[in-house]
UniProtKB/Swiss-Prot annotation:
Enzyme class: hydrolase
Name the record gives this protein: Succinyl-diaminopimelate desuccinylase
Classification of source organism: Bacteria, Pseudomonadati, Pseudomonadota, Alphaproteobacteria, Rickettsiales
Family: Belongs to the peptidase M20A family. DapE subfamily.
Subunit structure: Homodimer.
Positions with a binding annotation for Zn(2+) 2: 103, 138, 357
Catalytic reactions of this protein: N-succinyl-(2S,6S)-2,6-diaminopimelate + H2O = (2S,6S)-2,6-diaminopimelate + succinate
EC number: 3.5.1.18
PANTHER family: ACETYLORNITHINE DEACETYLASE, N-ACETYL-L-CITRULLINE DEACETYLASE
Annotated pathway: Amino-acid biosynthesis; L-lysine biosynthesis via DAP pathway; LL-2,6-diaminopimelate from (S)-tetrahydrodipicolinate (succinylase route): step 3/3
Listed InterPro entries: ArgE/DapE_CS, Bact_exopeptidase_dim_dom, DapE_proteobac, Peptidase_M20, Peptidase_M20_dimer, Peptidase_M20A
Amino acid sequence: MYTHYLKNLISFESVTPNSAGAVEYIDGLLKQHGFKTEIKIFGDSKNERVTNLYGVFGSNEPNICFVGHVDVVPAGNHEFWHNSNPFKFHEQDGKIYGRGAVDMKGAIACFLAASLNFIKNNMDFKGSISFLITSDEEGKSTHGTKEMLQYIYDQRYKIDFAVVGEPTCEKEIGDTIKIGRRGSVNFKLNIVGLAGHVAYPHKANNPLPCLIKILNELTNIRLDEGTEFFQNSNLEVTNIDVGNDILNTIPASAEACFNIRFNSLHSVETLSQLIEQIIKQYCKEYKVDYKLEYSSSAESFVQNPNDNDKIKEFADVIERTLKIKSEFSTSGGTSDARFVKDYCSLVEFGLLSEMAHKINEYTKISDLQKLYDVYYNFLMEIF
Protein backbone atom coordinates (compact mmCIF):
# COMPACT_ATOMS: atom_id res chain seq x y z
CA MET A 1 0.00 0.00 0.00
CA TYR A 2 2.75 2.48 0.91
CA THR A 3 4.73 1.57 -2.21
CA HIS A 4 1.67 2.37 -4.33
CA TYR A 5 1.31 5.77 -2.69
CA LEU A 6 5.04 6.45 -3.02
CA LYS A 7 4.99 5.50 -6.72
CA ASN A 8 2.28 8.06 -7.34
CA LEU A 9 3.89 10.77 -5.21
CA ILE A 10 7.27 10.44 -6.95
CA SER A 11 5.56 10.93 -10.33
CA PHE A 12 4.68 14.53 -9.45
CA GLU A 13 7.54 16.85 -10.43
CA SER A 14 7.00 18.96 -7.34
CA VAL A 15 10.19 21.01 -7.29
CA THR A 16 9.83 23.61 -4.57
CA PRO A 17 7.53 25.51 -4.23
CA ASN A 18 5.34 23.76 -6.81
CA SER A 19 2.84 21.10 -5.82
CA ALA A 20 2.57 19.85 -9.43
CA GLY A 21 -0.53 17.91 -8.36
CA ALA A 22 1.00 16.11 -5.38
CA VAL A 23 -0.96 17.96 -2.69
CA GLU A 24 -4.12 17.56 -4.73
CA TYR A 25 -3.48 13.81 -5.00
CA ILE A 26 -3.24 13.49 -1.21
CA ASP A 27 -6.35 15.63 -0.83
CA GLY A 28 -8.34 13.31 -3.09
CA LEU A 29 -7.07 10.22 -1.29
CA LEU A 30 -8.02 11.57 2.13
CA LYS A 31 -11.47 12.60 0.93
CA GLN A 32 -12.08 9.08 -0.38
CA HIS A 33 -11.49 7.78 3.14
CA GLY A 34 -13.74 10.20 4.98
CA PHE A 35 -11.35 13.00 5.88
CA LYS A 36 -12.55 16.57 5.99
CA THR A 37 -10.01 18.49 3.90
CA GLU A 38 -9.20 22.00 2.82
CA ILE A 39 -6.58 23.28 0.39
CA LYS A 40 -5.26 26.80 0.86
CA ILE A 41 -2.95 28.62 -1.53
CA PHE A 42 -0.77 31.33 0.02
CA GLY A 43 1.70 33.71 -1.58
CA ASP A 44 1.50 36.88 -3.63
CA SER A 45 3.39 36.37 -6.87
CA LYS A 46 3.08 33.51 -9.33
CA ASN A 47 6.49 32.14 -8.37
CA GLU A 48 5.67 32.16 -4.66
CA ARG A 49 2.21 30.63 -4.66
CA VAL A 50 2.28 27.67 -2.29
CA THR A 51 -0.27 24.87 -2.04
CA ASN A 52 -1.15 23.68 1.46
CA LEU A 53 -3.51 21.01 2.75
CA TYR A 54 -5.11 20.25 6.07
CA GLY A 55 -7.17 17.10 6.36
CA VAL A 56 -8.69 15.64 9.53
CA PHE A 57 -10.60 12.47 10.40
CA GLY A 58 -12.60 12.72 13.61
CA SER A 59 -13.42 15.61 15.91
CA ASN A 60 -12.33 14.37 19.33
CA GLU A 61 -9.10 14.76 21.26
CA PRO A 62 -6.30 13.94 21.01
CA ASN A 63 -5.57 15.11 17.48
CA ILE A 64 -2.41 13.42 16.16
CA CYS A 65 -1.14 15.30 13.11
CA PHE A 66 1.37 14.22 10.47
CA VAL A 67 3.28 17.24 9.15
CA GLY A 68 5.05 16.88 5.84
CA HIS A 69 6.07 18.44 2.54
CA VAL A 70 5.71 17.22 -1.04
CA ASP A 71 8.19 19.70 -2.51
CA VAL A 72 11.63 18.45 -3.44
CA VAL A 73 14.95 19.99 -4.40
CA PRO A 74 15.89 20.03 -8.11
CA ALA A 75 16.98 16.65 -9.43
CA GLY A 76 20.11 17.84 -11.23
CA ASN A 77 21.21 16.24 -14.49
CA HIS A 78 18.65 13.53 -15.25
CA GLU A 79 21.24 11.55 -17.21
CA PHE A 80 23.00 10.68 -13.96
CA TRP A 81 19.91 8.90 -12.61
CA HIS A 82 19.53 5.14 -13.07
CA ASN A 83 16.54 5.38 -15.38
CA SER A 84 17.21 8.95 -16.61
CA ASN A 85 13.97 10.10 -14.99
CA PRO A 86 14.06 11.02 -11.29
CA PHE A 87 10.29 11.53 -11.32
CA LYS A 88 9.48 8.02 -12.47
CA PHE A 89 9.19 5.28 -9.84
CA HIS A 90 12.11 2.87 -10.27
CA GLU A 91 12.44 -0.29 -8.19
CA GLN A 92 15.67 -2.28 -8.20
CA ASP A 93 17.33 -4.68 -5.74
CA GLY A 94 14.84 -3.96 -2.98
CA LYS A 95 15.20 -0.19 -3.33
CA ILE A 96 12.88 2.51 -4.63
CA TYR A 97 14.57 5.31 -6.54
CA GLY A 98 13.18 8.77 -7.25
CA ARG A 99 13.52 12.38 -6.19
CA GLY A 100 11.79 12.76 -2.84
CA ALA A 101 11.81 9.05 -2.00
CA VAL A 102 13.61 9.89 1.25
CA ASP A 103 12.85 13.58 1.70
CA MET A 104 10.02 13.16 2.29
CA LYS A 105 7.50 11.43 0.06
CA GLY A 106 8.39 8.05 1.54
CA ALA A 107 7.33 9.15 5.02
CA ILE A 108 4.12 10.67 3.65
CA ALA A 109 3.31 7.38 1.92
CA CYS A 110 3.93 5.42 5.12
CA PHE A 111 1.77 7.64 7.32
CA LEU A 112 -0.99 7.62 4.70
CA ALA A 113 -0.96 3.82 4.66
CA ALA A 114 -0.69 3.57 8.45
CA SER A 115 -3.50 6.02 9.20
CA LEU A 116 -5.89 4.70 6.56
CA ASN A 117 -5.35 1.11 7.68
CA PHE A 118 -5.71 2.14 11.32
CA ILE A 119 -9.02 3.88 10.63
CA LYS A 120 -10.25 0.87 8.64
CA ASN A 121 -9.43 -1.49 11.51
CA ASN A 122 -10.51 0.83 14.34
CA MET A 123 -13.52 2.80 13.15
CA ASP A 124 -14.67 3.56 16.69
CA PHE A 125 -11.36 5.01 17.94
CA LYS A 126 -11.60 8.04 20.22
CA GLY A 127 -9.61 10.90 18.79
CA SER A 128 -8.58 12.50 15.50
CA ILE A 129 -5.92 11.89 12.87
CA SER A 130 -4.86 14.75 10.63
CA PHE A 131 -2.41 15.73 7.90
CA LEU A 132 -0.77 19.10 7.32
CA ILE A 133 1.02 19.05 3.97
CA THR A 134 2.81 21.88 2.15
CA SER A 135 4.71 22.44 -1.09
CA ASP A 136 7.12 24.95 0.45
CA GLU A 137 9.64 23.46 2.88
CA GLU A 138 12.78 23.10 0.78
CA GLY A 139 12.65 26.75 -0.33
CA LYS A 140 11.75 29.92 1.52
CA SER A 141 9.23 28.21 3.84
CA THR A 142 7.35 31.49 4.01
CA HIS A 143 3.90 30.52 2.75
CA GLY A 144 3.82 26.88 3.80
CA THR A 145 3.51 25.20 7.19
CA LYS A 146 3.93 28.47 9.07
CA GLU A 147 0.93 30.16 7.43
CA MET A 148 -1.16 26.98 7.33
CA LEU A 149 -0.76 26.40 11.06
CA GLN A 150 -1.98 29.90 11.78
CA TYR A 151 -4.91 29.40 9.41
CA ILE A 152 -6.14 26.12 10.90
CA TYR A 153 -5.86 27.47 14.43
CA ASP A 154 -7.88 30.49 13.36
CA GLN A 155 -10.47 27.93 12.20
CA ARG A 156 -10.51 26.49 15.76
CA TYR A 157 -8.59 23.31 14.96
CA LYS A 158 -6.25 22.15 17.71
CA ILE A 159 -3.34 19.75 17.27
CA ASP A 160 -2.27 17.86 20.38
CA PHE A 161 0.83 16.13 19.03
CA ALA A 162 2.66 16.15 15.70
CA VAL A 163 4.88 13.72 13.85
CA VAL A 164 7.10 15.53 11.34
CA GLY A 165 8.28 13.06 8.73
CA GLU A 166 11.76 14.41 8.06
CA PRO A 167 14.47 11.81 7.35
CA THR A 168 16.04 11.67 10.80
CA CYS A 169 17.66 8.26 11.08
CA GLU A 170 21.41 7.81 10.64
CA LYS A 171 22.31 4.16 10.10
CA GLU A 172 19.08 2.24 10.64
CA ILE A 173 15.42 3.03 11.04
CA GLY A 174 14.70 3.89 14.64
CA ASP A 175 18.15 4.99 15.76
CA THR A 176 17.31 8.72 15.94
CA ILE A 177 14.38 10.87 17.00
CA LYS A 178 14.68 14.63 16.61
CA ILE A 179 13.31 16.50 19.63
CA GLY A 180 14.59 19.95 18.73
CA ARG A 181 16.73 21.91 16.31
CA ARG A 182 19.56 24.37 16.45
CA GLY A 183 18.87 27.98 15.58
CA SER A 184 20.45 29.64 12.57
CA VAL A 185 21.48 33.24 11.98
CA ASN A 186 23.33 34.73 8.98
CA PHE A 187 25.49 37.83 9.26
CA LYS A 188 26.79 40.16 6.56
CA LEU A 189 29.56 42.52 7.66
CA ASN A 190 30.86 45.39 5.54
CA ILE A 191 33.99 47.25 6.68
CA VAL A 192 34.33 50.70 5.08
CA GLY A 193 37.80 52.19 4.77
CA LEU A 194 39.35 54.58 2.26
CA ALA A 195 40.63 53.52 -1.17
CA GLY A 196 44.06 54.53 -2.38
CA HIS A 197 47.26 53.52 -4.15
CA VAL A 198 49.30 50.77 -2.49
CA ALA A 199 52.39 52.99 -2.80
CA TYR A 200 50.74 55.59 -0.56
CA PRO A 201 49.10 53.62 2.27
CA HIS A 202 49.24 56.66 4.55
CA LYS A 203 46.75 58.36 2.24
CA ALA A 204 44.30 55.45 2.46
CA ASN A 205 42.73 53.24 5.11
CA ASN A 206 42.73 49.58 4.18
CA PRO A 207 39.62 47.81 5.55
CA LEU A 208 41.17 44.35 5.23
CA PRO A 209 43.42 44.27 8.34
CA CYS A 210 40.43 45.14 10.49
CA LEU A 211 38.24 42.52 8.80
CA ILE A 212 40.95 39.88 9.19
CA LYS A 213 41.27 40.63 12.91
CA ILE A 214 37.52 40.44 13.41
CA LEU A 215 37.18 37.14 11.55
CA ASN A 216 40.16 35.68 13.39
CA GLU A 217 38.53 36.42 16.75
CA LEU A 218 35.09 35.24 15.65
CA THR A 219 36.37 31.92 14.32
CA ASN A 220 38.34 31.24 17.48
CA ILE A 221 35.69 32.20 19.99
CA ARG A 222 34.18 29.33 22.00
CA LEU A 223 30.50 30.22 22.21
CA ASP A 224 29.63 27.45 24.69
CA GLU A 225 30.31 23.82 25.62
CA GLY A 226 26.96 22.43 24.49
CA THR A 227 24.08 21.12 26.61
CA GLU A 228 22.49 17.77 27.44
CA PHE A 229 20.67 17.72 24.10
CA PHE A 230 22.79 20.09 21.97
CA GLN A 231 26.31 20.13 20.61
CA ASN A 232 28.27 23.35 21.07
CA SER A 233 27.24 26.37 18.99
CA ASN A 234 29.37 26.97 15.91
CA LEU A 235 30.32 29.90 13.67
CA GLU A 236 31.41 29.37 10.06
CA VAL A 237 32.68 32.04 7.65
CA THR A 238 30.87 31.52 4.34
CA ASN A 239 32.13 34.34 2.12
CA ILE A 240 34.81 37.05 1.90
CA ASP A 241 34.54 39.61 -0.90
CA VAL A 242 36.62 42.68 -1.63
CA GLY A 243 35.49 43.29 -5.21
CA ASN A 244 38.95 44.51 -6.15
CA ASP A 245 40.64 43.21 -9.30
CA ILE A 246 43.26 45.98 -9.40
CA LEU A 247 46.30 44.65 -7.59
CA ASN A 248 47.92 48.01 -6.89
CA THR A 249 44.81 49.53 -5.29
CA ILE A 250 43.81 49.49 -1.64
CA PRO A 251 40.09 48.64 -1.61
CA ALA A 252 37.47 51.01 -0.23
CA SER A 253 35.54 48.28 1.54
CA ALA A 254 35.58 44.59 2.37
CA GLU A 255 32.69 42.26 3.09
CA ALA A 256 32.37 38.97 4.92
CA CYS A 257 29.44 36.66 5.57
CA PHE A 258 29.17 34.09 8.33
CA ASN A 259 26.59 31.79 9.85
CA ILE A 260 26.06 30.67 13.43
CA ARG A 261 24.22 27.45 14.28
CA PHE A 262 23.36 27.84 17.93
CA ASN A 263 21.83 25.90 20.79
CA SER A 264 19.34 26.82 23.49
CA LEU A 265 21.94 28.78 25.47
CA HIS A 266 21.65 31.62 22.95
CA SER A 267 19.15 33.64 20.97
CA VAL A 268 19.52 35.70 17.81
CA GLU A 269 19.44 38.83 19.97
CA THR A 270 22.20 37.76 22.38
CA LEU A 271 24.43 36.56 19.54
CA SER A 272 23.99 39.73 17.50
CA GLN A 273 24.93 41.80 20.56
CA LEU A 274 28.07 39.71 21.13
CA ILE A 275 29.11 39.93 17.46
CA GLU A 276 28.59 43.68 17.28
CA GLN A 277 30.56 44.25 20.46
CA ILE A 278 33.59 42.52 18.91
CA ILE A 279 33.19 44.42 15.62
CA LYS A 280 32.95 47.80 17.35
CA GLN A 281 36.13 47.13 19.30
CA TYR A 282 38.25 46.52 16.19
CA CYS A 283 36.62 49.18 14.03
CA LYS A 284 37.42 51.76 16.69
CA GLU A 285 41.03 50.55 16.83
CA TYR A 286 41.45 50.71 13.03
CA LYS A 287 39.38 53.89 12.60
CA VAL A 288 37.00 52.40 10.05
CA ASP A 289 33.24 52.31 9.76
CA TYR A 290 31.10 49.23 9.47
CA LYS A 291 27.63 48.04 8.52
CA LEU A 292 26.27 44.83 10.03
CA GLU A 293 23.15 43.06 8.79
CA TYR A 294 21.74 39.80 10.06
CA SER A 295 18.75 37.57 9.44
CA SER A 296 17.51 34.41 11.10
CA SER A 297 15.42 31.54 9.77
CA ALA A 298 14.95 29.95 13.18
CA GLU A 299 15.61 30.21 16.89
CA SER A 300 16.77 27.04 18.63
CA PHE A 301 14.30 24.87 20.49
CA VAL A 302 14.26 21.60 22.40
CA GLN A 303 11.63 19.47 24.13
CA ASN A 304 12.84 17.44 27.07
CA PRO A 305 11.55 13.88 26.52
CA ASN A 306 11.55 13.33 30.27
CA ASP A 307 8.80 15.94 30.56
CA ASN A 308 6.66 14.78 27.63
CA ASP A 309 4.63 11.57 27.82
CA LYS A 310 3.90 11.35 24.08
CA ILE A 311 7.56 11.68 23.12
CA LYS A 312 8.36 8.88 25.57
CA GLU A 313 5.51 6.80 24.16
CA PHE A 314 6.83 7.30 20.63
CA ALA A 315 10.30 6.15 21.68
CA ASP A 316 8.80 3.15 23.49
CA VAL A 317 6.88 2.16 20.35
CA ILE A 318 10.09 2.23 18.32
CA GLU A 319 11.87 0.07 20.88
CA ARG A 320 9.06 -2.49 21.00
CA THR A 321 8.56 -2.53 17.23
CA LEU A 322 12.14 -2.45 15.96
CA LYS A 323 14.09 -3.68 19.01
CA ILE A 324 16.25 -0.57 18.97
CA LYS A 325 16.65 2.23 21.51
CA SER A 326 16.46 5.64 19.85
CA GLU A 327 18.85 8.51 20.49
CA PHE A 328 17.21 11.87 21.11
CA SER A 329 18.90 14.38 18.82
CA THR A 330 18.86 18.05 17.84
CA SER A 331 21.48 17.81 15.08
CA GLY A 332 21.13 18.87 11.47
CA GLY A 333 19.63 21.89 9.79
CA THR A 334 16.31 23.62 10.22
CA SER A 335 12.91 22.11 9.40
CA ASP A 336 9.24 22.99 9.64
CA ALA A 337 9.31 21.65 13.19
CA ARG A 338 10.44 25.16 14.14
CA PHE A 339 6.92 26.35 13.30
CA VAL A 340 5.03 23.37 14.72
CA LYS A 341 6.63 23.68 18.17
CA ASP A 342 4.75 26.93 18.75
CA TYR A 343 1.45 25.01 18.64
CA CYS A 344 2.09 21.57 20.11
CA SER A 345 4.74 19.07 21.17
CA LEU A 346 6.25 16.91 18.44
CA VAL A 347 8.80 14.42 17.25
CA GLU A 348 10.60 14.33 13.93
CA PHE A 349 10.95 10.79 12.67
CA GLY A 350 11.37 9.38 9.19
CA LEU A 351 13.69 7.48 6.87
CA LEU A 352 17.50 7.48 6.66
CA SER A 353 18.95 10.90 5.92
CA GLU A 354 22.00 9.68 3.97
CA MET A 355 20.46 9.81 0.47
CA ALA A 356 18.38 12.97 0.90
CA HIS A 357 18.89 15.49 -1.95
CA LYS A 358 21.40 13.21 -3.73
CA ILE A 359 21.48 11.91 -7.29
CA ASN A 360 19.79 8.48 -7.35
CA GLU A 361 17.97 9.22 -4.10
CA TYR A 362 16.48 5.96 -2.84
CA THR A 363 14.98 4.19 0.13
CA LYS A 364 14.93 0.50 0.91
CA ILE A 365 11.51 -1.13 0.79
CA SER A 366 12.36 -2.84 4.07
CA ASP A 367 12.90 0.60 5.63
CA LEU A 368 9.49 1.72 4.41
CA GLN A 369 7.97 -1.31 6.12
CA LYS A 370 9.72 -0.45 9.39
CA LEU A 371 8.56 3.15 9.22
CA TYR A 372 5.01 2.06 8.46
CA ASP A 373 5.08 -0.31 11.44
CA VAL A 374 6.23 2.44 13.81
CA TYR A 375 3.60 4.89 12.60
CA TYR A 376 0.82 2.29 12.79
CA ASN A 377 1.84 1.04 16.23
CA PHE A 378 2.08 4.59 17.53
CA LEU A 379 -1.52 5.23 16.50
CA MET A 380 -2.50 1.98 18.22
CA GLU A 381 -0.66 3.13 21.35
CA ILE A 382 -2.27 6.58 21.43
CA PHE A 383 -5.82 5.51 20.65
